């Protein structure tokens, strides 16, 4: 072995001794990265995400207009983690979490860790401490817009605090990203939408908290209401579109459409009818839906109700859909060539 190679090997051993195994490696040793994913709680969203759920050890941003279903999407993820025996935490910066609604969605509120911090700094320090513990499987911060810097809270009404929140988020994400990857915690940041002033062309919408979150997020979901669902004159829920605007573990720009029912969350039966009909697992003839020559009902709402009343049929349809897409619980996917970033046009602001 030449002196140069010997010197390099000694340097590599010294680096690994000081900083731990894996702190430096040859590029060819780790071209494919194994990423464990956990189901999102929505079959349609799992399909759109490509990998079958949310990746562990990554930052995820869920944003959209008010009352579009952002918190509902996050709560379903918490319920899925808890079903698998995982520990979940919710940092409620908006002080608006409804325990009754969370319970209806399948969240075990007795086991859910809840923090309602006073300042943005406090919220992010709590989040960092939980992630670094390595004992939390999913952490939700609701919302970035409500992470008010201490200086703004203690200042006078009308004082200008330009860029404070963006700097706070940038610093927090620099500290959080490495710890998140090591602890394999799923960190979900819920965010709101703001309008940029004076934009004549292009999309005037942006998200608070600066650009850092856009760059550090492996997955960004845009949640929007498409239409209101009615039964007679009563409004019972929303048809909601979830667009994957950034995805570093699978191809982006796919869309999932779900029914979010008031007080119940994402309608499992609605997803089974829609995806089942697309795959011809559920047959549609005119307005009638049927499965294995058994009629489910006339019209989508009646078919949904029939599935709700017959859980065995719903379970059979769900299993066939899961088998088709390979969505059977928590799994590991291989991320190839995760070079830089797969950014949406929204990131080029």
Swiss-Prot record:
Highest taxon of the lineage: Bacteria
Localization: Cytoplasm
Chain residues that bind ATP: 64-71
Database matches in SUPFAM superfamilies: P-loop containing nucleoside triphosphate hydrolases (SSF52540), RecA protein, C-terminal domain (SSF54752)
Keyword Disulfide bond: no
CDD domains (alphabetical): RecA
PROSITE patterns: RECA_1, RECA_2, RECA_3
Gene3D superfamilies in UniProt: P-loop containing nucleotide triphosphate hydrolases
Keywords: ATP-binding, Cytoplasm, DNA damage, DNA recombination, DNA repair, DNA-binding, Nucleotide-binding, SOS response
GO process annotations (BP): DNA recombination; DNA repair; SOS response
UniProt-listed InterPro entries: AAA+_ATPase (IPR003593), DNA_recomb/repair_RecA (IPR013765), DNA_recomb/repair_RecA_CS (IPR020584), P-loop_NTPase (IPR027417), RecA-like_C (IPR049261), RecA-like_N (IPR049428), RecA_ATP-bd (IPR020588), RecA_C_sf (IPR023400)
Gene Ontology molecular function: ATP binding; ATP hydrolysis activity; ATP-dependent DNA damage sensor activity; damaged DNA binding; single-stranded DNA binding
NCBIfam families in UniProt: tigrfam_recA
Family from the record: Belongs to the RecA family.
Full protein name: Protein RecA
